[in-house]
């Protein structure tokens, strides 16, 4: 029923793409891993939509002999786990995408950095020591979409440079095709990601996204929007991400929650650690009639300096959320010492343990966590620190879902 509803809301080619993807994965019944083998292209408004034809590679099933105390074995999955997609309860979908990054690039390689960092994470989590037993499996981002992304980076950089030197104001028509190509690229990636989320959800999996920049979670909310399930969002970030557009990009990382708020069943957006925003965003917050609630970083710090506890603030944050919650974590919500190479670092922010405490309070509240994303992790040129921290945040998110 879900697919018929979705087909009626989108174009024929997009619907066919999603249907083919669903059918291809429907054969993955016996402990298999999906590998992209070839693609077929079809026209959509003179652009292309990637249609994947999948082959299935049998994996060795998870064995009772797995030693969670040992070092990660060569060729193992995320966190060194040997489980298959079928065995795993939690699926992580990597999204290698950063077309609108406006400061430091590198988040496109965030999923790989987190995967590598996960090999250094001991599996006995302090709060959720058995989370590894649930099984965590990391999906694959299609090579064809990564190639599409990389092919559009020059257009993105040309637009951003033209904005900086004023050329785009004098000759806007020169950049219309670039904007259109980037928007079409987003739509192709979004179609794949919606189908992927829908597939794993139909299999009863818990699903988390791993970006990439913060533009990437929009399809998750579009999927939730089609379920007509009312929910709220806990958004941890240095930035409000409520701009109508940024640098002319409709799907900018700075516009993710402006776009998400168009989805009617999003009851409330609760933002934490915010410390960088524009006048337009502040006005939207003030005029939201309580739909957007912000716990600004400076206000949180002031209250704590004056004797308020982090526990009390976290209780207020949790109480602001409805019973069903989606969690969106931009790594730059943390102090930059924990994510020095992220796309747009801002002084201040949460300590690592403050974030862990807040996430635990969500879990303890009994609220249902529908899904999550972790975005904006960016590896340093000669450092694995960002990936190490990101892997630990991701592991904790797996513990609370």
Give the location of each predicted region:
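Conserved alpha-helical scaffold segments that buttress catalytic/binding sites
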Residues: 59, 63-401
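Residue-level recognition of conserved structural "scaffold" positions that shape functional pockets
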Residues: 17-18, 33, 219, 280
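Positively charged N-terminal leader segments that act as targeting/secretion signals
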Residues: 25, 42-43, 48
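Hydrophobic alpha-helical signal peptides and transmembrane signal-/tail-anchor segments
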Residues: 1-11, 18-21, 32, 36-38, ...
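Short, Lys/Arg-enriched N-terminal segments with co-localized hydrophobic residues
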Residues: 46-61
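Intrinsically disordered, low-complexity, charge-rich segments with an acidic bias
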Residues: 30-33, 104
């Amino acid at each position: 029923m879900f697919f018929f509803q979705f087909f009626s809301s989108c174009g024929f080619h997009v619907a066919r793409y999603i249907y083919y993807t669903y059918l291809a994965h429907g054969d993955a019944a016996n402990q298999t891993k999906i590998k992209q083998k070839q693609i077929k292209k079809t026209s959509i408004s003179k652009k292309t939509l990637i249609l994947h034809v999948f082959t299935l590679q049998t994996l060795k099933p998870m064995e009772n002999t797995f030693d969670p105390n040992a070092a990660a074995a060569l060729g193992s999955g995320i966190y060194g786990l040997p489980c298959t997609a079928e065995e795993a309860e939690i699926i992580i979908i990597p999204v290698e995408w950063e077309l609108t990054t406006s400061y430091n690039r590198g988040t496109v390689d965030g999923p790989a950095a987190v995967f590598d960092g996960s090999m250094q994470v001991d599996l006995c989590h302090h709060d959720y020591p058995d989370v590894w037993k649930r099984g965590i499996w990391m999906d694959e981002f299609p090579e064809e979409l990564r190639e599409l992304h990389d092919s559009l980076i020059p257009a993105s950089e040309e637009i951003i440079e033209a904005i900086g030197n004023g050329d785009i104001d004098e000759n806007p028509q020169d950049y219309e095709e670039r904007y259109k190509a980037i928007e079409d690229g987003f739509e192709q990636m979004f179609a794949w990601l919606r189908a992927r989320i829908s597939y794993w959800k139909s299999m009863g999996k818990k699903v988390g996204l791993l970006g990439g920049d913060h533009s990437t979670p929009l399809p998750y909310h579009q999927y939730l929007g089609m379920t007509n399930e009312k929910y709220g969002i806990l958004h941890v970030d240095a930035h409000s991400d409520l701009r109508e557009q940024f640098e002319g990009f409709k799907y900018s990382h700075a516009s993710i929650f402006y776009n998400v708020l168009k989805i009617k069943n999003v009851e409330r957006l609760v933002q934490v650690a915010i410390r960088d925003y524009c006048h337009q965003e502040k006005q939207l917050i003030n005029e939201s009639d309580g739909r957007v609630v912000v716990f600004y970083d400076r206000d949180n710090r002031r209250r704590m300096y004056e004797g308020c506890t982090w526990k009390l603030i976290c209780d207020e944050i949790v109480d602001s959320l409805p019973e069903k919650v989606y969690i969106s974590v931009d790594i730059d919500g943390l102090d930059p010492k924990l994510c020095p190479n992220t796309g747009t670092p801002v002084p201040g922010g949460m300590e690592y343990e403050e974030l862990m405490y807040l996430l635990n309070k969500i879990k303890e509240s009994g609220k249902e966590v529908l899904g999550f994303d972790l975005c904006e992790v960016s590896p340093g040129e000669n450092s694995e620190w960002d990936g190490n921290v990101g892997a630990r945040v991701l592991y904790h998110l797996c513990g609370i879902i």
